[in-house]
Amino acid sequence: IKAFLQRYQVGTYSEHLSYTNDGGYLYDLLPIPMTEDAVRYVSERILRVQDILGQKLVLENVSTYLMPHAEMSEAEFVAEVIKQADCELLLDVNNVYVNSINHDTNPYAFIEKMPSERIRYLHIAGHEQVSNQLLIDTHGAAVLPTVWDLLELAYAKLPTIPPTLLERDFNFPPFAEP
């Protein structure tokens, strides 16, 4: 990865803050238990990777459908990992909203707890509503007004507006005809 980043002069390397390996690749973004032990473990690994790569990582908060063994809130967990690992944050605003419904939390409070000086990029997207208590981050629907409102809140926290990506993987709306 380091050789690739150097060869192509890639200034930013981002990754999801999740488990993807348990003795073999899992090909999914599984939630990390939100514990002090996990904060230390993950932060130490991030610091090692940053040392090897010679640059800071940018970590993205993920959508989750279970919160195994949570000892702290997701906002506390993400903020503490970012702090201890001295890395940056790709704030996925739709994931904040999806998790707020799935885990009955306050998405506005989550964004307020994020270290604004470490927010490097933002994502927004649409999702699928399976039930009143379950949303799936699909990137296959229009962005809800509430997600746009959360994006505005995130922008208001920042001294400058960072690059923001609208993720849409399928169910594209028709293009307007000239």
What role is predicted for each listed range?
Residues 1-89:
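Active-site acidic/histidine proton-transfer and metal-coordination neighborhood
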Residues 13, 92, 164:
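A residue-level signal for conserved active-site and pocket-lining positions in enzyme catalytic cores
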Residues 16, 125, 167:
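Conserved residues at the C-terminal ends of beta-strands
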Residues 19-26, 126-134, 171-172:
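Conserved radical SAM core fold
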Residues 31-39, 99-159, 175:
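Gly/Pro-rich active-site loop or hairpin
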Residues 50-134:
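Acidic/histidine-rich catalytic cores of soluble enzymes
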Residues 55, 158-162:
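A short helix->loop->beta-strand "cap" motif at the edges of active sites that frequently abuts
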Residues 166-174:
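A short, acidic, flexible beta-alpha connecting loop/helix-capping segment that sits on the rim
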